[in-house]
Amino acid sequence: MPKTNSSAASTNANPSSLQQHTPMMQQYLKIKAEHPDILLFYRMGDFYELFFDDAKKAAELLDISLTARGKSGGNAIPMAGVPYHAVENYLARLVKMGQSVAIVEQVGDPATSKGPVERKVQRIVTPGTVSDEALLNDKQDSILAAVFCPTQKANQELIFGYATLDVTSGRFTLCELSGEEALAAELQRTNPVELLYPDDFAYSHLINQRKGLRRRPQWEFDLQTATNQLTSQFGTNELSGFGVQNHQVGICAAGCVMQYIKDTQRSALPHIDRIVLESHNDTVVMDAATRRNLELTFNLSGGIENTLASILDKTSTPMGSRLLQRWIHRPLTDVTVLKKRQRNIQGLMESPYTQLQSALKKIGDMQRVLARLALRSARPRDFARLRQAFALLPDIQHYLEHEISHTSESAQPSDLLHLAEKISQYPDFADLLERAVIEAPPVLIRDGGVIKEGYNEELDRLRELSKGATDYLEELELREKERTGIASLKVGYNRVHGYFIEVSRSQSDLVPVEYVRRQTLKNNERYIIPELKEHEDNVLSSQSRSLALEKRLYDELFDLLLPQLTQLMQSADALAELDVLTNLAERAESLDYHRPELCPQSGIHFSQGRHPVVEQVSDAPFIANPINVNPDRRMLVITGPNMGGKSTYMRQTALIVLMAYIGSYIPAQDAQIGPIDRIFTRIGASDDLASGRSTFMVEMTETANILNNATANSLVLMDEIGRGTSTYDGLSLAWACAEYLATKLQSFTLFATHYFELTGLADALPELANVHLDAVEHGESIRFMHAVQDGAANKSYGLQVAQLAGVPKLVVQAAKRKLHELETGDISKQGRQETSPVNTVYATEKVETQLDLLSQTSEAEDLLHSIQPDDLTPKQALDYLYQLKKLVR
């Protein structure tokens, strides 16, 4: 089974022998026994301490000191700790590593406690349940997921139940997936930060590389238990109102999620008020390999640079950024929805949308603020953000209702007006927060200073008592100096001893009899008098009552806002959607994207197609290329040199199609794109050492998935099939796969290969065409043209690419001789050279490496001699100019 990434449950102490420990350690061990699988942060004064195995693990993960405290069984008890004021930083690091932490706070009063101060677990922080701003990545969803697979009967289809919850937005979904590939794809799409699975889960190989794994008892996946959990949360008698009642395997997974979130949050969850059945019938399906190879939101190294999302995402709000990523990972097949998005984008492009972006930037992450409101964990600055958002909503609504509908002839007003209605306005809430919360509140309510003056008369009165303390103390000090004649007399205060009258020791014999000594210092004596004691009681009482009242008023803000939580969440969702649409309008205008036509007829056609990522990160001008596949031309066999652009051309086609199916404009012109149900890629491969699979096995597994699942409406990218085995095996497999895709499946396929024998398929199969990316040789160098042309390439230029890569010239020259032998048939059928073993390709080293320096010309000269100026387009001429600049550097 997979590791759970949790703290070891064992410690060096046996809870059954608690009596050998101090009372404090007994208390710790009892609490730890209730949370054996997670780290326990145990509050002691100004630190959170960890003991035993927790201390060892925390010291390693957080790079903090490991010390010792007391003994257990004759051995020192390992201990580590972090200061309470910096705990959020440490929690953020642990959550990022997939760890969970139980926070134990002191809840008793040390002054009245007999024995250790009472402590309780106040919150449990896990990767999938955190809502604190400091612990979250604001541009990525924080998904808690559960997977369940019932015991399979003979010949029964393999079904997985999969449920996800984003506690920071309340979005709760379930689905049922057929087979391992479907589950792998869904895990890749949703990328949960925490994954729950039953302790008898039989498919550990699908999840054991993930962080944040949590093994759960089987009873949490019981159907009746799960149903009860869900109906209890939603306040319903059954689940039929959500349309999920027939998806029992998915319900089992969702029930586990709900049980876990209740166990960890220990509070009401009013924003989780529904569950949505996710169907893949209305989406363009992509498997895990495709999502990875296309580098949608993460590149092949796991970073976020040079991905499709990094180019498309210039959103104004974090919630808009997260929604855009969900759109990218879930392209739709519903053309009605997609055309509506296109109309909205066009309407925004024809309006002064920068005003809208400025307003949205000030809105911030309203979704997550509202989630903290629902969990009653919102902080003072969250209320300040809500106040600012409420103040901006009227301007945004006015913009949607007037600026766009009056200036745009393209967008149907009802499209964006519907968003305006969902955004709504909350003038009462705006007024409430304006009156209640100060302009720049502190981070926490703990020490008060949040509620604005004038909001509550009693609070103002109590605060005045505290403020008046300074005037009174100054007056008392002057009065006592005059009365006693002691010039050094001062009135002061500290938190330990309270208020006091301080007199230098040399004048202490002058103090009146009613002065009662409170503290003796080296050079001074401190006293208290009845009048000052009475003032102290009044002030401290007023401060205590003021803070208690302020906290009560703060809690009342939750009570006043929460009844409208559902509508507020709908407003936040609408703002996120508006942000994405505005962002796509800006991207289309800034990056010269065009509106594609989504057609009912099969096929993919566009001109001047560009790779959305490569064109932005490349220094050289990007060479745009067309594509045309249709029912009469379903497969393109693509040949050409390595580095010639074959993979870029294939990927750009898939990305352009995907962008069209999220409703975006695309980096291509004259686009007509027909129905697409799936996108498959078989591009690149590496060993899967963890599963014991070779590169070739990975390649064949991905190929098998394509051949078993592709349809006539699928887009398939196949790159270098068969290269991981012998030449004849590889060629045979590539030939058979190409023929099967073209004739049996009839998928729209881009098939890149270096097996030039495959180009002969075009003579036998009318639905197959050859295209190539050309290159031009200049002496010893090569220049890649990157332009797609009809017909097959005449060679692969592998030796020239090897030379560019820095392979020693001696090796390249030897390879050229061997290539000549192979091409002229100087190798026997057995593959042995008809010469002495000593007569190798390096035998003529002395002759061949003797260079004629005088006869050599520069690469720049060779290139200039090869150019025919009258045949060049302006674009090609500019291209040559860039190439010449590189050569003369």
UniProtKB/Swiss-Prot annotation:
Query: Some GO term, biological process aspect, for this entry: which one?
Result: mismatch repair
Q: Which SUPFAM superfamilies match?
A: DNA repair protein MutS, domain I, DNA repair protein MutS, domain II, DNA repair protein MutS, domain III, P-loop containing nucleoside triphosphate hydrolases
Origin species, per record, is Pseudoalteromonas atlantica (strain T6c / ATCC BAA-1087)
What gene, per UniProt, encodes this protein? mutS
Q: Which keywords fit this entry according to its UniProt record?
A: ATP-binding, DNA damage, DNA repair, DNA-binding, Nucleotide-binding
This molecule's function is given as: This protein is involved in the repair of mismatches in DNA. It is possible that it carries out the mismatch recognition step. This protein has a weak ATPase activity.
Superkingdom field:
Bacteria
Region of interest (Disordered), residue spans: 1-20
PANTHER family (alphabetical): DNA MISMATCH REPAIR PROTEIN MSH1, MITOCHONDRIAL, DNA MISMATCH REPAIR PROTEIN MUTS FAMILY MEMBER
- Protein name (database record): DNA mismatch repair protein MutS
Q: Which family would the database say this protein is a member of?
A: Belongs to the DNA mismatch repair MutS family.
Q: Which SMART domains match?
A: MUTSac (SM00534), MUTSd (SM00533)
What's a Gene Ontology MF term here? damaged DNA binding
Residues the entry annotates as binding ATP: 640-647
The record, for Pfam families, names:
MutS_I, MutS_II, MutS_III, MutS_IV, MutS_V
List the biased-composition ranges (Low complexity). Answer: 1-17
Note the InterPro entries from the entry: DNA_mismatch_repair_MutS, DNA_mismatch_repair_MutS-lik_N, DNA_mismatch_repair_MutS/MSH, DNA_mismatch_repair_MutS_C, DNA_mismatch_repair_MutS_clamp, DNA_mismatch_repair_MutS_core, DNA_mismatch_repair_MutS_N, DNA_mismatch_repair_MutS_sf
GO cellular component terms attached to this protein's record = cytosol
